[in-house]
Amino acid sequence: MASFKLWVCLILLLLEFSVHQCRPLVAEESPSDSGNIRKIMRELLKRSEELKVRSKDGQTVLGTLDSKRLSPGGPDPRHH
């Protein structure tokens, strides 16, 4: 009986491994393809410029990422 349980266990393990195969999500591209890298860099630069806002004195401050909250914030400041 123990032999039968062992075989069932091994078959279940093999079936489990055969169902879950490792595959890359994106097809690999050649490392010499610098056109895509340039495109990605341009997009990152454009998005980072969208997030920046200049103040009156010329300093760059982050516009949407600035937190206006006072620490600890919330309705009850003595909560924590």
Curated annotation (Swiss-Prot):
The keyword ATP-binding does not apply. The keyword Signal applies. This is CLAVATA3/ESR (CLE)-related protein 4. Residues 55-80 are annotated as: Disordered. Glycans are attached at residue 75. Keywords: Developmental protein, Differentiation, Glycoprotein, Hydroxylation, Secreted, Signal. It comes from Arabidopsis thaliana. Residues 1-22 form the signal peptide. GO terms for biological process: cell-cell signaling involved in cell fate commitment; regulation of meristem growth. It comes from the Eukaryota. One of its GO terms (cellular component) is apoplast.
